[in-house]
Amino acid sequence: MGLEHRYADNFADAIPLEFAPEESEASIGQLSAAVKRAIDLTAAAILLLILWPILLLTAILIRLDSIGPVFFRQTRLGLRGRPFHILKFRTMSVLEDGEHIVQATHNDPRITRVGRILRKISIDELPQLINVLRGEMSLVGPRPHARAHDEYYAQRIANYTLRQQAKPGITGWAQINGFRGETPTVHSMRKRILCDIWYVRNFSLWLDLKILLFTPFELLRQRNAH
């Protein structure tokens, strides 16, 4: 399976789901998992050291632009369904309580002026480097969804929870194939989930590297970013 984006439209419909969770866990292996964790720790620490001026400036702009905290915290489900608190820069003027989740949409009035810029280039996700240091997330893996979305889609998409057999990531296979942003229908979410499951099944350090290399190009394309 190559990484060329021109295959993305048909890719998700072609993924077989006939494999058990234990297969995906075994496919990673202890050595690969240890190397992946070492890479996560090293890269996250280096990126935080390099990017701290941008993080500080972003925090200041958020406080100047709208009333509310700098960070948005929300409970998400991580590896094997373990809950953790994800960190993001706040980009909305209305904070959700975690019980009634409404996805951000194009020209969403809740998004602040600064927040719109942050979301376009995914700077709002940078605090998740702290989640990576804590071991709650990885640089690469399925994006963690709000718990309300997990509950909703788990009842409507077969094998939905198989995506939780990998540690959630800041970027992933679904994202570099354009499956990011709003998922207005179950069908659109299913395509994203199938990409996540494909990643779990086909994990390799080389695949992680390719995803990391393609991520900046996808950010520049800004497909479905809002």
Outline where the language-model segments fall:
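A short, structured surface patch at a secondary-structure boundary
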Residues: 105-167, 211-219
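Short, glycine-rich, amphipathic interfacial segments at transmembrane boundaries or analogous
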Residues: 4, 8-15, 72-110, 171-192
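C-terminal terminal-structure detector
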Residues: 31, 159-226
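Membrane-interface alpha-helices
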Residues: 63-80, 224-226
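Alpha-helical membrane-protein architecture signal
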Residues: 31, 35, 39, 73, ...
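Transmembrane helix and adjacent juxtamembrane "hinge" segments in multi-pass inner-membrane proteins
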Residues: 24-72, 211-214
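N-terminal hydrophobic signal-anchor/signal peptide
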Residues: 1-49, 161, 199, 220, ...
